[in-house]
Design a protein with these regions (language model features):
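Catalytic histidine-centered segment of alpha/beta-hydrolase-like enzymes
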Residues: 259-262, 279, 283-298
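Acidic catalytic loop of the alpha/beta-hydrolase fold
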Residues: 226, 256-260
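Short alpha-helix in the alpha/beta-hydrolase fold that links the catalytic acid
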Residues: 247, 261-270
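Gly/Ala-rich beta-loop-alpha elbow adjacent to hydrolase catalytic centers
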Residues: 94-103
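Alpha/beta-hydrolase-fold enzymes
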Residues: 84, 88, 102-213
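Short, surface-exposed "cap/lid" segments of acyl-processing enzymes
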Residues: 1-59
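Short beta-strand/loop motif that positions the catalytic acidic residue
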Residues: 245, 251-253, 257
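Alpha/beta-hydrolase active-site loop
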Residues: 64-85
Length: 312
C-alpha cells in the first residue's frame, strides 16, 4: 500500500484536500497517464491538493486480505494520513469503479457510526462509474452464478490471477479489441488520438491480481446476494447502508460503459440521503470517462466545477 501526494501546480490552493481511491484490479496510473492526459494533473493545475492510493500488487501471502482490511483499516488509515499531512479536518474522496465502491462502503459505515450530530472527516464524495446494484451486472452474475466455484480458483492461486481478471473483463465485450483496432485505423492520420488510445489500451491489459479474500466477498455478498441494495451488507461488525450517507455526492457515469452499466450504478444517487446529490452522464466508455477525450473536454471540467463550489 502506498499513498502518493501531488503538489498543486498553482499559487491559490483549495483548503479541502482530495483523496483518490483507485480500483483493486487495475493500476492507478490511468488517472495520471502523461502530461496533458492526466486527471491528477488537471486537478493540480486547478488548485487542488491531491493524494492517491496505490493498493499494490498482492502476493500469495496477501490472499486473505478482505473487505474488512480495506474498508475498516487501510482506507481509514489513508484518510487519517491525508488529514494529518494537510493539516485539515475534512477531505473530499474521489473513487473510481471498485475504488468508488470501497469509498461508498467506508462512507456509509463511518456516517452510521457517527450519527447525525457528529461531522466526520468526509466533506464531499465523488464516485466515477461505481457499481452498487449487482442486478445490473447481468453478464458477471451469469458467469459467476451458483455453478461458479470461486473456492477452487482461490485454492489453486490464492489470489485471482491478473490474466483471469483481464479475461473476465474482456468477456463483457468480446469484440471490443477488434472494434478498438478498427477505430484506430479510421483515425490513423490523427497522431495525438492514436497515441492516447494506445496508452489507454496498454493500461487495460495491465491488470493486477484480485486479493482472494475480497474476491470471495464480492462474489458472494455483492454479485450473488446484492447485499448493498438489499441492506444486508455487513463489513465486520458494521452494516453498510447507503441511506446513512448524507454528504454532498457526485456520480460521474459513462454512457457506453460495458463494465459498469447504468443499471448497476444508477441506484447510488437514488439511495443516499444527501440533499446535495448529482448524477452526470458523459459520452464514452469506462476508461474514456477518466482518461479519454470526453474526460478532458467534459468530465474533468464538470468534476472541477463541482468540487470547487464545495472545497472552500
Amino acid at each position: 500500500l502506498k499513498l502518493h501526494h501531488f503538489t498543486p501546480m498553482c499559487d491559490e490552493v483549495y483548503r479541502v484536500p482530495v483523496l483518490i481511491v483507485t480500483s483493486l484490479v487495475n493500476q492507478p496510473y490511468i488517472l495520471d497517464l502523461v502530461p496533458g492526459q492526466s486527471m491528477v494533473e488537471f486537478l493540480l493545475k486547478k488548485g487542488f491538493d491531491v493524494y492517491m492510493i496505490e493498493w499494490g500488487r498482492p502476493r500469495k501471502e496477501h490472499r486473505n486480505l478482505s473487505l474488512e482490511d480495506h474498508v475498516l483499516d487501510r482506507l481509514p488509515a489513508c484518510v487519517n494520513k491525508v488529514l494529518s499531512h494537510s493539516g485539515e479536518s475534512q477531505l473530499s474522496i474521489i473513487g473510481y469503479c471498485v475504488g468508488g465502491l470501497l469509498a461508498v462502503l467506508w462512507a456509509a459505515i463511518d456516517a452510521a457510526m457517527r450519527g447525525k450530530v457528529s461531522a466526520g472527516p468526509l466533506k464531499n464524495l465523488v464516485c466515477m462509474a461505481t457499481p452498487v446494484n449487482s442486478d445490473g451486472l447481468e453478464s458477471l452474475k451469469t458467469w459467476m452464478g451458483p455453478d461458479f466455484d470461486e473456492e477452487a480458483l482461490l485454492a489453486e492461486h490464492g489470489n485471482v490471477p491478473a490474466e483471469w481478471v483481464q479475461n473476465a473483463l474482456r468477456s463483457l465485450r468480446p469484440f471490443g479489441k477488434v472494434a478498438g483496432a478498427a477505430n484506430l485505423l479510421n483515425q490513423a492520420d490523427q497522431e495525438a488520438i492514436v497515441r492516447s488510445n494506445l496508452r489507454m489500451g496498454k493500461w487495460e491489459t495491465d491488470n493486477i491480481p484480485f486479493p482472494g479474500g475480497v474476491f470471495r466477498q464480492m462474489v458472494n455478498d455483492f454479485l450473488r446476494d446484492n447485499c448493498l441494495i438489499n441492506g444486508r451488507w455487513k463489513i465486520g461488525a458494521y452494516s453498510a447502508d447507503l441511506a446513512a450517507i448524507r454528504v454532498p455526492l457526485l456520480h460521474l457515469l459513462a454512457q457506453d460503459d460495458h463494465i459498469t452499466p447504468y443499471a448497476s450504478s444508477r441506484d447510488l444517487v437514488q439511495r443516499v440521503s444527501s440533499s446535495d446529490r448529482e448524477e452526470v452522464m458523459i459520452k464514452g466508455g469506462h476508461v474514456g470517462l477518466v482518461a479519454g477525450r470526453g474526460a478532458q473536454m467534459r468530465m474533468w471540467p464538470a468534476l472541477e466545477a463541482w468540487l470547487a463550489q464545495r472545497s472552500a
